[in-house]
């Protein structure tokens, strides 16, 4: 264990706070902070566009970013099944280190446990994050009718990527996960405008479930337009073949942003300047009709309600 800590963890997450190896990380702050935690049990461990290591960093960082916080520190805890190949573990650690370094965050504390075979499935990871809040309070209570809804990129990529890899589906094409940390996309926009009311990342349950949560928490209705929702042809085809609506498939590198109507096009233009925001779209608006519900204007010219996810067709996608 000590050799693993010295040769892998301390070496690859190299920073003076972690090197102290104290029971807690000693941090000095006088500013407003955001603090979050998340656990990751994705199966398979690797998928097109990422792995459990990258996901464990991006997922927690994105939760901080959605609150208007610049991520700074992470904790890392790993529960490893006895018999996991060392090369697999090393690859995951390398992925964590690389993703954290690119994001400019430090892993300053952590834990490592080995459990008997069968007590977990290969490896489970928990990360917690601390970030410095740079905006006013982002809240669903800020939302008013006429506010616009933006999604920052093509939806459903992660959910379908993981499912296809897990089931070894021969779809005739690959679907790459959108797994990415969003600080380089979102933070510059937050620094240039105060017109953002609220943000969420549409992970479990996808865009549909996240929009329903926003509608319920704001006490208002949301109407979206099917023709405006950015969806790749591969995800559309996979959804039709598997009977899964892409609106319910998880994203791990997208944000849903509620903005003032008059600033929506300006914010959209800012997002599109970054590679992760190239396919950003205004997909709908907040209304006073059907409070707490989400309605979609379909490409057939009809309307229907979009409900919360009631069962999970894509378990263990994060």
Which sequence ranges carry the predicted segments?
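Extreme N-terminal cap/leader segments of soluble proteins
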Residues: 1-49, 67, 76, 95-108, ...
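Acidic, Ser/Thr/Pro-rich beta/coil linker or hinge segments at domain junctions
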Residues: 2, 9, 274-318
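A generic local secondary-structure boundary/capping motif
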Residues: 14-16, 23-25, 65, 97, ...
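Beta-strand->loop->alpha-helix junctions that form or flank phosphate-binding loops
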Residues: 16-20, 202-203, 221-230, 248-250, ...
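Glycine-rich anion-binding loops of enzyme active sites
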Residues: 29, 33, 40-42, 70-162, ...
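Small-aliphatic-rich amphipathic alpha-helix that forms the alpha element of a beta-alpha
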Residues: 48-74, 94-102, 184-191, 209-212
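Active-site-proximal betaalpha loop/short-helix elements
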Residues: 81-83, 175-251
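Helix N-cap motif at beta-to-alpha junctions
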Residues: 259-265
């Amino acid at each position: 264990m000590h050799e693993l800590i010295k040769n892998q963890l301390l070496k690859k997450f190299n920073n003076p706070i972690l090197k102290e190896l104290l029971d807690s990380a000693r941090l000095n702050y006088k500013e407003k902070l955001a603090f979050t935690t998340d656990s990751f049990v994705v199966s398979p461990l690797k998928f097109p566009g990422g792995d459990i290591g990258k996901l464990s960093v991006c997922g927690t960082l994105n939760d901080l970013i959605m609150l208007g916080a610049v991520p700074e520190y992470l904790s890392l805890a790993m529960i490893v099944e006895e018999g996991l190949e060392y090369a697999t573990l090393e690859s995951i650690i390398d992925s964590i280190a690389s993703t954290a370094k690119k994001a400019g965050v430090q892993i300053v504390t952590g834990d490592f446990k080995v459990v008997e075979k069968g007590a977990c499935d290969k490896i489970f990871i928990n990360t917690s994050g601390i970030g410095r809040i740079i905006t006013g309070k982002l809240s669903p209570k800020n939302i008013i009718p006429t506010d616009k809804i933006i999604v920052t990129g093509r939806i459903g990529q992660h959910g379908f990527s993981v499912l296809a890899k897990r089931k070894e589906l021969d779809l005739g094409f690959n679907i790459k996960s959108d797994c990415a940390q969003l600080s380089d996309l979102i933070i510059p926009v937050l620094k240039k405008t105060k017109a953002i009311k609220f943000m969420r990342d549409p992970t479990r349950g996808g865009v549909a479930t996240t929009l329903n949560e926003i509608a319920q928490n704001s006490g208002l209705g949301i109407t979206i337009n099917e023709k405006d929702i950015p969806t790749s042809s591969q995800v559309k085809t996979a959804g039709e073949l598997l009977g899964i609506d892409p609106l319910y498939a998880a994203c791990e590198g997208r944000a849903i942003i509620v903005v003032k109507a008059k600033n929506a096009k300006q914010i959209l233009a800012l997002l599109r300047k970054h590679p992760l925001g190239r396919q950003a779209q205004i997909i709908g608006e907040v209304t006073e009709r059907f409070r707490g519900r989400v309605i979609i204007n379909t490409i057939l010219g009809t309307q229907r309600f979009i409900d919360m996810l009631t069962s999970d067709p894509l378990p263990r996608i994060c």
